[in-house]
């Protein structure tokens, strides 16, 4: 990407109406959600793209730094930091990462150029507890929509470890 694309802050996301944003970010790389002629990005996507130097985010006429976008995200979601680490790790590995809110998970993950996602990702801190009932419910939903359930565990050193959890029938 050569020229930085301008996005504008709007609540808990950012948007651009520039055709370049739609072509380069949405069509070619799977970022955001297209509504009419606007490309909307989540704060996690925006933070990632600002950190990479691909976009800049304006609030009124003032450009927001990566740290300011991160703080906005953290105010809206106390787990923004660990979700960002997982998002960044998956994107850096070449996967397309989208919200999985409607599936009761944090992210759905696609292989590049795939039409359907393979995985649902639930992000947890290593110190968090997850009840067997919660885990079972998440695996059932994933199985019901033909996806693999993956727990992304972030440790105290901010390293991410992925655990695939499967439904087994005997």
Curated annotation (Swiss-Prot):
Q: Which Pfam families match?
A: tRNA_int_endo, tRNA_int_endo_N
- Name the Enzyme Commission number(s) assigned to this protein: 4.6.1.16
One GO BP annotation of this record: tRNA splicing, via endonucleolytic cleavage and ligation
List the GO molecular function terms.
lyase activity; nucleic acid binding; tRNA-intron endonuclease activity
Q: Where is the active site?
A: 110, 116, 147
Q: Keywords of this protein's UniProt record, alphabetized?
A: Lyase, tRNA processing
Q: Which reaction does it catalyse?
A: pretRNA = a 3'-half-tRNA molecule with a 5'-OH end + a 5'-half-tRNA molecule with a 2',3'-cyclic phosphate end + an intron with a 2',3'-cyclic phosphate and a 5'-hydroxyl terminus
Q: tRNA processing among the record's keywords?
A: yes
Q: Which GO terms describe its cellular component?
A: cytoplasm
Which InterPro entries does the protein's record reference? tRNA_endonuc-like_dom_sf, tRNA_intron_Endo_cat-like_sf, tRNA_intron_Endonuc_cat-like, tRNA_intron_Endonuc_N, tRNA_intron_Endonuc_N_sf, tRNA_splic, tRNA_splic_arch_short
Q: Which CDD domains did the record assign?
A: tRNA-intron_lyase_C
Q: Which family does it belong to?
A: Belongs to the tRNA-intron endonuclease family. Archaeal short subfamily.
> Which HAMAP family would you find in this protein's record?
EndA_short
| Task of the protein | Endonuclease that removes tRNA introns. Cleaves pre-tRNA at the 5'- and 3'-splice sites to release the intron. The products are an intron and two tRNA half-molecules bearing 2',3' cyclic phosphate and 5'-OH termini. Recognizes a pseudosymmetric substrate in which 2 bulged loops of 3 bases are separated by a stem of 4 bp.
Q: Which PANTHER family match?
A: TRNA-SPLICING ENDONUCLEASE SUBUNIT SEN2
- Summary of subunit composition and partner proteins: Homotetramer; although the tetramer contains four active sites, only two participate in the cleavage. Therefore, it should be considered as a dimer of dimers.
Descriptive protein name: tRNA-splicing endonuclease
Originating species: Pyrococcus abyssi (strain GE5 / Orsay)
